[in-house]
């Protein structure tokens, strides 16, 4: 995190207004403005582990990563600055949670890119903190209101589920493919053969559908699942539990918290971070897999066909094969050999 996002640049146009404010930053925190903003006090709350990693280097205990915000995260803050994400249900979940903890009378600012749908903040908060647009620049909108009424928030009411091939998939707002199995994951699942054995790592596990499907027909696998998203981690745990399956699930920025080696690594890696296209996670996944695969172990990933993964795979492993494809997606398979660049 270094250069400021357009949303942060819009906020900086109003920096003089915040000098006496005790601010809680939340939402899609794509830069380190919360650590550098001049104000009376600054805290941050995030559901994204990689955002927590970046901010905690400068903010220490004043930034927290978790599924839901707690009263201690709000502490004595009198102002919320919320960065609007591209996912509206995610925004609603986070705002209802945070505003249920903020004291009535708190200042509420919402900022985001127009293309992210930040305009939806006005109707969403109309009953709690009626918003007015106070600035428009850098293709972003900045909105302000005062909290008039705290919303009621209950985590249980936000859970949803769907069924696929006899499996119950538990989901939360902000989890990839929350409303059903995406086409890419479906293609990857079609390549997983029954009676797979050994240690399997599911990177970017989302709601845990890949691992649950694999374990349902390969009961001898030992599952490890990880994701940067707190809702995804909790959803995966719930999915495994709902289907009587076992596995270790934890938050990790690709391999940052992963220890040991595996016989198979599976993933449908993201190529967006917030509104921005980013291949960082996929590149880290491919290059880091060398250090986490046993000899003869396999990396199997699905990706949009237009993404330049073959080049990265060949640079890292010396080869790749496409084992399934449609017009939009390809499933790549690589077997760990001595030639791979460690």
UniProtKB/Swiss-Prot annotation:
Protein's job: Specifically methylates the guanine in position 1207 of 16S rRNA in the 30S particle.
Family as reported in the entry's similarity comment: Belongs to the methyltransferase superfamily. RsmC family.
Pfam families according to UniProt: MTS, MTS_N
Protein name: Ribosomal RNA small subunit methyltransferase C
Keywords: Cytoplasm, Methyltransferase, rRNA processing, S-adenosyl-L-methionine, Transferase
Top-rank taxon, per record: Bacteria
Top enzyme class: transferase
Transmembrane stretches, start-end: none
Catalytic activity: guanosine(1207) in 16S rRNA + S-adenosyl-L-methionine = N(2)-methylguanosine(1207) in 16S rRNA + S-adenosyl-L-homocysteine + H(+)
Subcellular location: Cytoplasm
EC number: 2.1.1.172
Gene Ontology cellular component terms for the protein in this record: cytoplasm
Quaternary structure and interacting proteins, as annotated: Monomer.
Gene Ontology MF terms: 16S rRNA (guanine(1207)-N(2))-methyltransferase activity; nucleic acid binding
């Amino acid at each position: 995190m270094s250069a400021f996002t357009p949303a942060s640049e819009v906020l900086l146009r109003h920096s003089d207004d915040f000098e006496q404010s005790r601010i809680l930053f939340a939402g899609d925190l794509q830069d380190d403005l919360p650590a550098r903003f001049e104000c009376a006090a600054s805290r941050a709350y995030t559901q994204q582990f990689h955002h927590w990693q970046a901010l905690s280097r400068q903010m220490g205990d004043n930034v927290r990563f978790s599924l839901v915000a707690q009263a201690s995260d709000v502490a004595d803050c009198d102002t919320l600055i919320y960065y609007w994400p591209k996912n509206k249900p995610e925004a609603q979940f986070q705002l209802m949670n945070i505003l249920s903890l903020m004291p009535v009378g708190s200042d509420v600012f919402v900022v985001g890119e127009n293309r992210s749908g930040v305009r939806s903040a006005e109707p969403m908060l109309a009953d709690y903190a009626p918003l007015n647009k106070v600035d428009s620049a850098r293709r972003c909108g900045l909105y302000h209101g005062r909290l008039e009424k705290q919303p009621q928030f209950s985590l249980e009411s936000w859970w949803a589920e769907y069924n696929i091939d006899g499996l119950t998939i538990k989901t939360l707002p902000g989890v990839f493919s929350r409303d059903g199995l995406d086409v890419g994951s479906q293609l990857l699942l079609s390549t997983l053969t029954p009676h797979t054995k050994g240690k399997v790592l599911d990177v970017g596990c989302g709601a845990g559908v890949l691992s649950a499907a694999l374990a349902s027909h390969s009961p001898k696998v030992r599952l490890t699942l990880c994701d940067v998203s707190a809702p995804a981690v909790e959803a995966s745990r719930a999915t495994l539990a709902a289907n009587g399956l076992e596995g270790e699930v934890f938050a990790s920025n690709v391999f940052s918290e992963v220890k040991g080696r595996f016989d198979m690594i599976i993933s449908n890696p993201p190529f967006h971070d917030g509104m921005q296209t980013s291949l960082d996670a996929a590149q880290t996944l491919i290059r880091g897999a060398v250090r986490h695969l046993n000899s003869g172990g396999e990396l199997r990933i699905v990706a949009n066909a237009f993404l330049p993964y073959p080049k990265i795979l060949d640079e890292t492993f010396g080869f790749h094969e496409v084992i399934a494809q449609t017009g939009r997606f390809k499933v790549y398979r690589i077997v760990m050999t001595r030639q791979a660049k460690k």
